[in-house]
A protein has these predicted regions:
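Short polar catalytic/cofactor-binding loops
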Residues: 17
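Intrinsically disordered, low-complexity, charged/polar segments
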Residues: 42-61
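Coiled-coil-like amphipathic alpha-helices with heptad-repeat character
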Residues: 6, 29, 49-53
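Basic/aromatic-rich interaction segments and small domains that mediate binding to polyanionic partners
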Residues: 21-48
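Short, exposed beta-strand/loop patches in secreted or surface proteins that constitute
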Residues: 5, 25-28, 58
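Mixed-charge, Lys/Arg-rich low-complexity intrinsically disordered regions
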Residues: 1-7
């Protein structure tokens, strides 16, 4: 998915390195060209660059 198409508050699926898929919400940008996501219960915070977003994040269906 293109990073410029992300919507704050939108739900997405992140595919981890081991193949497991995790539902995450986009919570904004950190001002450094990186994108911040949280899991549904906000237990984990992920910060991705645009390459990771393009390769491993897709829209929630």
């Amino acid at each position: 998915m293109d990073a410029n198409k992300l919507i704050i508050g939108g739900r997405y699926i992140y595919q981890m390195l081991d193949g497991k898929e995790v539902e995450v919400s986009h919570t904004g940008n950190d001002g450094d060209g990186r994108y911040v996501f949280h899991t549904r219960r906000r237990m984990y915070r992920f910060v991705f660059g645009p390459d990771t977003v393009r390769d491993r994040v897709r829209a929630y269906e």
